[in-house]
Amino acid sequence: MKSYAKYIPHLLVVIVFFMISIPLWLKVDVLPMRLWDESRNAVNAIEMYQTGDWLVRTYDFAPETYELKPPLLTWFQVASLNIFGLNELGIRFPSVVFSLVTLIVLFSLVYRMTRKWYIALLASFICATSAGFYTAHLGRFGDHEALLVCLYTCLFYVVYQYSSTERVRYIYLTALTVALAVLCKSISVGMLLPGIFLFLLFDKKILPLLKNKHTYLALLLGAVPVFAYYYLREQVQPGYLEMVWQMELFPRFFNTSTELVFQEDPFSYYFNLIRNSQMEYWVWSLILVILAPFIAKKLDRQWAFWSIQAALFLLIISSGTKNFWYSAPAIPMLAGAIAISVHLLINKNRKYNLTLGLPLLVMSVLSYQKAYKYAMQPAERYYEWETNGISHFLKNENHLANITSNTKVLLDDQYGFEPHKFYIEALKIERGLDIKRTELYNIKPYDTLLISHLSTLQKLKESYGIEV
């Protein structure tokens, strides 16, 4: 019996990992493509699937002028479409995998820091059950964030390993991970580098790194694929680099772009978001992160690693333009900081086991219930039905019997977004249906129209006799 006892922790880890994976994949294909930015990514992927052009993302089969990020995510999505078909699962499956990899890497890193499997499991559990990890635009959907967060977590792993061992291979792995992050979402990885630099400075590893010739070779090797991609893209799509500058780099961050204008939000935007929704229950455990070094009476290296990363990253993104998904990379950082803080407190005094155990258990149950409910009951918000109504119609087999190539899509003049475009292209490929968009002034008698806005219906009633 004793020989089997050593496998109990392994079994518990597997069981808990299966549990926390459920909110990532359960009913992942029920909701249609989301407007920002999944539906655009899906069109990029289905067009690359058709053309085989692996260099340039396209929309309406013309080079992208809005979604300007390199195509690393698109490559994964095209591969997935070839496996699962032209559907939501084909677009979202890579994100689910990336999110699971994030949890595994986070577990591995915290375990290396503490050698305690339950502390490592706590970090992954906190991350997986935080709404800022799995909800819209994040771990369950075909946006860039799942891949980006995965790459960031891998970057933390290799940086920490370098700091602990000073092995050359981790320098090269760091350069590779940064290069992949750039090919995922441009220079957003740059917002992590100050925190990494500060930790290496704290850990007295900056000078050895700067003196190592492999640092510069790794930097060169990492830069080659990045510069090669942007150079080739500019050759194929002249003006691409100028668009990237305006829409992806500093003008976007400081909200001075000539192409995009963002709503001005307060500096506290992300802190409020984490408190109110993204870590709704776990936010109370962040108190432990503040208390841990004082109670432990030491500035622990592992605590500093996570706390420096999280604090500096949140301060940097709070200084620029804001979208709710920009804070996604902070969730694994905060989860790591909380888990390490619990570890420090327990090591300081065993009486904290019960003191911390009960509130952590309550937070775990509440957070998991929220995550499971989100996955189990996917539904449109009342204000999303007009935007996504056509998508629901086109993905329903019962409705497709009434659709022909003479059916046209008529959208609202002001809110005429096209999150359904992926479905239109999929129907053209799979069924030969060529559904075009039309305008109010082009409508002819006996046209069959797909509409989803009440304002459009009202305009039709004012000018035509209609049959629904």
Regions from the PLM with identified roles:
Residues 10-15, 106-130:
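Transmembrane-helix signature of polytopic, membrane-embedded enzymes
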Residues 22-27, 41-65, 72-75, 79, ...:
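Extracytosolic helix-loop segments that constitute the early lumenal/periplasmic catalytic or substrate-binding loops
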Residues 41-47, 180, 189-299, 309-320:
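Transmembrane-lumen/periplasm boundary regions of multi-pass, lipid-linked membrane glycan transferases
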Residues 93-117, 154:
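Transmembrane-helix motifs of polytopic, lipid-linked glycan transferases
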Residues 114, 153-173, 295-296, 342:
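Membrane-interface transmembrane helices that cradle and orient dolichyl/undecaprenyl
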Residues 320-350:
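Hydrophobic/aromatic-rich transmembrane helices and adjacent perimembrane loops
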Residues 343-373:
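Signature aromatic-anchored transmembrane alpha helix within multi-pass, membrane-resident enzymes
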Residues 372-460, 464-468:
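Short periplasmic/luminal acceptor-recognition loop of GT-C membrane glycosyltransferases, typified by
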